[in-house]
Amino acid sequence: MQSNKTFNLEKQNHTPRKHHQHHHQQQHHQQQQQQPPPPPIPANGQQASSQNEGLTIDLKNFRKPGEKTFTQRSRLFVGNLPPDITEEEMRKLFEKYGKAGEVFIHKDKGFGFIRLETRTLAEIAKVELDNMPLRGKQLRVRFACHSASLTVRNLPQYVSNELLEEAFSVFGQVERAVVIVDDRGRPSGKGIVEFSGKPAARKALDRCSEGSFLLTTFPRPVTVEPMDQLDDEEGLPEKLVIKNQQFHKEREQPPRFAQPGSFEYEYAMRWKALIEMEKQQQDQVDRNIKEAREKLEMEMEAARHEHQVMLMRQDLMRRQEELRRMEELHNQEVQKRKQLELRQEEERRRREEEMRRQQEEMMRRQQEGFKGTFPDAREQEIRMGQMAMGGAMGINNRGAMPPAPVPAGTPAPPGPATMMPDGTLGLTPPTTERFGQAATMEGIGAIGGTPPAFNRAAPGAEFAPNKRRRY
């Protein structure tokens, strides 16, 4: 359907304007008679119609799936514009082909630029509006040069359009990325990258020229250079050739084959020999470059193998070093744990020894306190002995007094003590009770009734020196 419309439009452009309008009006009148009236045009801007022509374009049919809109590829150059044209008139001129994204007019030089939604719509507008008369001038519509496009060479074999776009998107927004292939679909090692602006293209060109930009594992960098803007669609029409003196001189002879033996033939053959030599030298250069590439690839593979082996060795050494370091750390941890256990054991023993000493000290203090409160038997015997000796001395003093007359035949009363032949008193040892004065002392008789406590002398008796009566 699209090709038929394009063919009809191209055919109409080669007919006179009046005949074209008359023929189109007749065709439109016949369509109105045969078909019902068309539905109303929606207000969403997806369909548009021109004032001069009744042809409508469905914009949905001219947009490919996933195609980016308003790119540099859909930018048109419009020449031979009237000097008084405005942007509003130019938008109205292209209103049939959808909403324009960019309109620029250079009134002094008589040209301008306009950007449409898609490449297909721009192609249709170019075909329909090229050579259209406008205020006494014929419009010249061409595709604008893409100044932000780059040519990429030395692409690896397994680089696709998507990978190429992803790789160069680090420099800026990429509108289109294409890997050029031959007629069999095999990659040629070349590609085209189109950016949305010149700064991104300049950045990519500078970075790739200064460094080595790799796209795959294969370490062959790509080369980037500005793309040659060549017009292989319109070419050079006869009407655009400058008709100067050199033009007329060159056009004196029509196209022909040179006759053998003539002047033209001789120099034509010399030109052919030069061209053949250039071709042979170019082929030789290509062969040398190919051999050098193959040699470099072989060296690169060998070096890559050695590099991988070296990396494996380094990784093995690194792992061994890491294992050794882990073992050292483990040994240090074990030593620290052992030292900690030894310190804990020593601390435990020290605490036990301290507790034992404290217990012994406590027991010793308890024993000393018990002894201080309750004197032992030896001390008690000494004290009782001293008391007994004091009492004996008092008795002896008493015995020095003249005895009372005792009737004959009366037995002597029992005294408190009896002098032994060895000069000692016949006293019984004191008891071990705490209060010895309460015990009954043998060998000491009652003197005038109940014996006094602590060996007190009888009333009226004389006391020893340094002794006083106890009450």
UniProtKB/Swiss-Prot annotation:
Residue positions, PTM N6-acetyllysine: K5, K11, K198, K295, K371
GO molecular function: chromatin binding; DNA binding; identical protein binding; lncRNA binding; RNA binding
Gene Ontology cellular-component terms listed: chromosome; fibrillar center; membrane; nuclear matrix; nuclear speck; nucleoplasm; nucleus; paraspeckles
Residue numbers of Phosphoserine PTMs: S147, S262
Positions where N-acetylmethionine occurs in the chain: M1
Coiled coil: 268-372
Span of domain RRM: 74-141, 148-229
Residue stretches of biased makeup (Basic residues): 14-27
Modified residues (Omega-N-methylarginine): R456
Tissue: Heart, brain, placenta, lung, liver, skeletal muscle, kidney and pancreas. Also found in a number of breast tumor cell lines.
Spans annotated as Disordered: 1-51, 443-471
UniProt keyword Hydrolase, yes or no: no
One Pfam family of this chain: RRM_1
Chain positions with Phosphothreonine modification: T6, T428, T440, T450
Region DBHS, residue ranges: 54-373
Gene Ontology terms: biological process: activation of innate immune response; cellular response to angiotensin; cellular response to hypoxia; circadian rhythm; DNA recombination; DNA repair; innate immune response; mRNA processing
Keywords: Acetylation, Activator, Biological rhythms, Chromosomal rearrangement, Chromosome, Coiled coil, DNA damage, DNA recombination, DNA repair, DNA-binding, Immunity, Innate immunity, Intellectual disability, Isopeptide bond, Methylation, mRNA processing, mRNA splicing, Nucleus, Phosphoprotein, Repeat, Repressor, RNA-binding, Transcription, Transcription regulation, Ubl conjugation
Function field: DNA- and RNA binding protein, involved in several nuclear processes. Binds the conventional octamer sequence in double-stranded DNA. Also binds single-stranded DNA and RNA at a site independent of the duplex site. Involved in pre-mRNA splicing, probably as a heterodimer with SFPQ. Interacts with U5 snRNA, probably by binding to a purine-rich sequence located on the 3' side of U5 snRNA stem 1b. Together with PSPC1, required for the formation of nuclear paraspeckles. The SFPQ-NONO heteromer associated with MATR3 may play a role in nuclear retention of defective RNAs.
Involvement in disorder: A chromosomal aberration involving NONO may be a cause of papillary renal cell carcinoma (PRCC). Translocation t(X;X)(p11.2;q13.1) with TFE3.
Protein name per UniProt: Non-POU domain-containing octamer-binding protein
Native organism: Homo sapiens
